[in-house]
């Protein structure tokens, strides 16, 4: 049986880990290198590092901090933010990332997905999609959730998977930071259309939210930030709870 994964997320702005709600109201939390070290020791299955303002500010991702983070951990590291070209993929992978997350860059130039998959393999290309309901439709947002692209999220995600994305990280803007549970309706809609590992992001508030999430078909991992950063829920405690309730975890 394939084990499920618990993934903490470091949203980094100006070299610091930050956290907001519904992608707004960003507050400073901690140093990313210290947090990466802590999560590695705490039993996280993977770590996600997002430079959350790189795309909006039209610049490249912070490679100096990323290199330090990568050197401190021994679990898979996925990195995103400001990834717009194959050169960006190269730079991020050379810093120590295992997988590269692409979001706004693919929306600007969809050919980036098949080109990256051809060069590095599908397993290296993670589609990150920021999704929000607009007039009853799931829509894709760009630039850190600031810009409505007008694209149907389900169609966009399906296209990316068909063209080389090997994993999907689905960020629900509607549930982000609210701590009332994952966006199961959106996740189910995506899982019914694609057959790749899906990481659910946005809305985790308690361990029961993860248990409910993993009862839904096609969801491989739960990602969270605030509840882990603020120590409202320990990763080891969460994994032991899930394991005891029939969800296979790596302990």
Regions found by a protein language model. Give the residues of each.
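Structural preference for beta-strand elements that scaffold enzyme active sites
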Residues: 5-9, 46, 74-78, 99-101, ...
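Conserved, mostly hydrophobic/aromatic
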Residues: 11, 39, 47, 79, ...
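Conserved anion-binding
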Residues: 12-14, 18-19, 97-170, 174-175
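Glycine/small-residue-rich loop that forms an oxyanion/phosphate-binding "nest" at active or ligand-binding sites
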Residues: 53, 61-120
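Charged helix-capping and loop-helix junction motifs
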Residues: 60-67, 110, 150-154, 180-188
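Glycine-rich phosphate-binding active-site loops on the catalytic face of alpha/beta enzymes
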Residues: 91-112, 172-177, 203-209, 217-236
């Amino acid at each position: 049986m394939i084990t499920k994964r618990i993934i903490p997320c470091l949203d980094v702005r100006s070299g610091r880990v930050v956290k907001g709600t519904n992608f707004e109201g960003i507050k400073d939390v901690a140093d990313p290198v210290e947090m990466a070290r802590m999560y590695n020791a705490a039993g996280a299955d993977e770590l996600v590092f997002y430079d959350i303002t790189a795309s909006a500010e039209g610049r490249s991702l912070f490679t100096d901090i990323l290199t330090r983070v990568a050197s401190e951990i021994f679990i898979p590291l996925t990195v995103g933010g400001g990834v717009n070209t194959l050169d960006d993929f190269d730079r991020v992978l050379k810093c120590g990332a295992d997988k590269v997350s692409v979001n706004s860059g693919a929306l600007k130039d969809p050919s980036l997905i098949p080109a990256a998959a051809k060069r590095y393999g599908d397993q290296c290309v993670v589609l990150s999609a920021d999704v929000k309901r607009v007039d009853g439709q799931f829509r894709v947002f760009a630039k850190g959730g600031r810009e409505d692209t007008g694209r149907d999220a389900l169609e966009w995600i399906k296209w990316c998977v068909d063209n080389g994305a090997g994993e999907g990280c689905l960020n629900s803007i509607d549930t982000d930071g609210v701590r009332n549970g994952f966006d199961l309706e959106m996740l189910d809609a995506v899982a019914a259309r694609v057959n790749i590992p899906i990481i659910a992001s946005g809305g985790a508030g308690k361990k029961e939210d993860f248990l409910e999430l993993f009862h839904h078909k096609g969801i491989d991992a739960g990602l969270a930030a605030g509840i882990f950063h603020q120590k409202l829920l320990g990763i080891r405690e969460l994994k032991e709870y899930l394991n005891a309730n029939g969800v296979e975890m790596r302990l």
